[in-house]
């Protein structure tokens, strides 16, 4: 079967729409606690729990989760097993209603107009994890979402320039 069947694409599109709608609702209705000065994990926790509870009746049959822990198990030199390469997903949607199963991982990063903040998300510990599939092994897509700390005109053009540059392509 086609990895990106039309049903899978339709479900993925709906998942993204639900997440974006939840974001807009929180930004509008909970500006006191859902804003750029909060820690990233606080924002994704609130968003994840809000989606899981408030968006239960939107017609998606899968499960939302946030801050899922992932790791790799390897054999140590002494012969025992050990956990290595620990990581955490910000928000994840999973459904096995159809095959292949749909697992969408959303990673959120705070972005402003500065080079320093963009550079913090480049390389092996940044966007490369989505290119190499470290967070969404076997999935056709993973989603990195920028949380803009400044107005869109201040952040987005510089980010687009960076992503289209040689340095951005290497990241």
Positions of predicted regions on the chain:
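Short, small-residue-biased leader/transition segments that mark boundaries at the very start
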Residues: 1-5
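Phosphate/oxyanion-binding active-site loops and adjacent basic polyanion-contact surfaces
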Residues: 8-15, 36-47, 83-85, 119-123
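Acidic-basic catalytic patches of nuclease active cores, encompassing PD-(D/E)XK
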Residues: 15-78
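Active-site metal-binding core of divalent-cation-utilizing nuclease and nuclease-like domains
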Residues: 63-101
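Conserved catalytic cores of phosphodiester-cleaving nucleases, focusing on short active-site segments
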Residues: 91-93, 104-112, 130
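Mg2+/Mn2+-dependent nuclease catalytic core
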Residues: 111-133
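Nucleic-acid nuclease catalytic cores
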Residues: 136-160
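Acidic, Ser/Thr-rich peripheral helices and adjacent loops at domain boundaries
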Residues: 159-171
């Amino acid at each position: 079967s086609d990895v990106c069947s039309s049903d899978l694409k339709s479900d993925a599109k709906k998942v993204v729409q639900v997440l974006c709608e939840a974001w807009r609702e929180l930004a509008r209705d909970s500006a006191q606690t859902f804003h750029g000065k909060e820690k990233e994990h606080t924002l994704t926790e609130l968003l994840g729990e809000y989606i899981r509870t408030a968006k239960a009746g939107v017609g998606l049959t899968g499960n939302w989760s946030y801050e899922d822990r992932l790791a790799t198990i390897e054999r140590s030199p002494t012969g025992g097993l050990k956990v290595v390469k620990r990581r955490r997903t910000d928000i994840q949607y999973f459904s096995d209603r159809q095959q292949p199963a749909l697992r969408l991982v959303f990673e959120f990063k705070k972005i402003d107009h500065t080079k320093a903040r963009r550079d913090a998300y480049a390389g092996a510990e940044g966007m490369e994890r989505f290119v190499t599939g470290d967070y969404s092994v076997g999935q056709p897509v993973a989603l990195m979402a920028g949380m803009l700390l400044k107005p869109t005109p201040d952040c987005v053009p510089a980010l687009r320039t960076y992503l289209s540059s040689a340095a951005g392509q290497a990241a």
